[in-house]
Amino acid sequence: MPFAVEQALIGEHPAIVKLRALIERVAAAEVTVLITGESGTGKEVVAQAIHMRSPRCNQSFVPVNCAAIPHDLLESEMFGHERGAFTGAAGSRHGLLTTADRGTILLDEIGEMPIGLQAKLLRVLEDGVVRPVGSDRATRVNVRVIAASNVDLGDAVARGTFREDLFYRLQVVPIVVAPLRERRSDIPLLTEHFLERIRDRTPRREITISREAMVALWSYDWPGNVRELENMVERLAILCENSTIDMAMLPENLVAGARPATPPLKVKLNDGGVNLNDLVRELEGRLINDALKQTGGNKQAAARMLGLKRTTFSAKLRRCGVIAPASLDQSEEG
């Protein structure tokens, strides 16, 4: 079955839709890619999607976390070594670049790579050769390099901790993965996806989430992004004693960190009273406007966020006089 990018990168926010389209275009090209995004946004998922949609899809995809391997071992891990190259090298060993030959290697957290090793990586990108530690022979490899970082490598270049020539060689195509707080409209979709996976593992247990709890998840900023949301849904499902995740189950830090969806209305009663219809219309207008902002102008996603049918949402939109961003909304009408 062909790899489906939309199943790996779930969401309907314009940012994720554009990302999926970019992956499709980049996958077929034999260029290096630099993926930047906060921790937990899914940079490895993006890299794997590029690999799986590329002509190299039947070959190896080798992820390497440069921050998780001690600096003195990273060169040997990546390039391999000859017997006796260093203390403990009892035999020769291929490196991960050779393992990824004809496939793709992901160098995650590449900003942690020692600057001396960066020069050796640059030669791989320019000449396509790998020289194991302790060897005077170079081996030719055909490997696509994708790099990822949760920090701005441009700043690292300015500080002198990252080679400028390697930086430009890596970001032939730069990809930025948006944090989850910038595409809140996808939180219900992601939550349901994670719950569905849990249901598949435990088919006898049907777990749902209350509307109030979903609003709290939507309102939270998720500093750990999609990974944090996934872990939270898993945790809540495990601790759920019945079939519904409700507000009482949410941790205090999540509830406290959830921002109000819209500013409160300040109502002052006087002798003449208030016009309740006008107040309701004003509140509806604020909520609709906030939902449209969070969904990038996507009416369908905004309607779902507010629990409304599309026709009802459109009617309220007209009644409240809210103008949706036309440039974004046109893409969903086609």
Positions of PLM-derived features:
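Short gly/ser/thr-rich secondary-structure transition/capping motifs
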Residues: G84-G91, D127-P132, D155, K268-D271
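Nucleotide-binding/hydrolysis machinery
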Residues: P2-V17, A21-E24, S54-Q59, G134-R144, ...
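Conserved post-Walker A coupling segment in P-loop NTPases
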Residues: A8, A15-T87, T98-P114, N142, ...
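Conserved RecA-like P-loop NTPase ATPase core
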Residues: L19, T41, V64, M78, ...
